[in-house]
Amino acid sequence: MEAAADGPAETQSPVQKDSPAKTQSPAQDTSIMSRNNADTGRVLALPEHKKKRKGNLPAESVKILRDWMYKHRFKAYPSEEEKQMLSEKTNLSLLQISNWFINARRRILPDMLQQHRNDPIIGHKTGKGAHATHLQSTEASVPAKSGPSGPDNVQSLPLWPLPKGQMSREKQPDPESAPSQKLTGIAQPKKKVKVSITSPSSPELVSPEEYADFSSFLLLVDAAVQRAAELELEKKQEPNP
């Protein structure tokens, strides 16, 4: 009887010892796996977070660097002395400043240059300055062309036709020389009259072909003067009553 009693006890004891372990193992496995996954997620997230912190510079430092780049946007390559000065202002290392400028020249500088081209105020200022310089150059060239006003320029004043009576009084020849003048007038060919019309801004000579009517008018005046001289000569030759 004792042996029979001991036999079932021995057969039941392993089942009783193993069954609780088998029933608890799935729950323990899932909890362990979830903890392991959470730990691995934290481990993977830490380097990313650290990288983000490394890439972000202080906003004040970035503003100082951007201002410097905008002032020197046409030559955004700071020297060693300028890097040292920026390092003191921004509290950044020389390596950080060099890396920032390398990236900024590719990403920020093109936008700055495009904004400078599209800004109407800057374009108006540059156009106004160019117009002022053009005016200064033209003002400097005008005196050289016109020259100083003096007695030499008085001689190049326009010649206007005088009235017939005044011309006859001034050019009235002597009675004795009237026949000789008539002969010379017939023998000599017609001379071209050169007329120069000038103004202070354009001292250019005018060709006589443009004023052909004016030259014929002068020839008519000369003929009238000669006729008047002939009439006076005839009056003098007539006997007094």
UniProtKB/Swiss-Prot annotation:
Which SUPFAM superfamilies does the record associate with it? Homeodomain-like (SSF46689)
The alphabetized UniProt keywords are: DNA-binding, Homeobox, Nucleus, Transcription, Transcription regulation
UniProt main location, coarse = nucleus
**What does the entry list under GO cellular component?**
nucleus
Where do the record's region annotations for Disordered lie? 1-58, 127-207
Pfam families, alphabetized: Homeobox_KN (PF05920)
Q: Where in the cell is it found?
A: Nucleus
How far does the signal peptide extend, from start to end residue? none
Q: Name one GO molecular function term.
A: DNA binding
One GO BP on record is: regulation of DNA-templated transcription
| Keyword Ribosomal protein included in the entry's annotation | no
Q: Where on the tree of life does the source sit, at the highest rank?
A: Eukaryota
User: What are the DNA-binding region positions?
Assistant: 48-111
For this chain, the family text in UniProt reads:
Belongs to the TALE/TGIF homeobox family.
Q: What does this gene product do? A: May have a transcription role in testis.
What's this protein's name? Answer: Homeobox protein TGIF2LX
Q: Which organism is it from?
A: Pan paniscus (Pygmy chimpanzee)
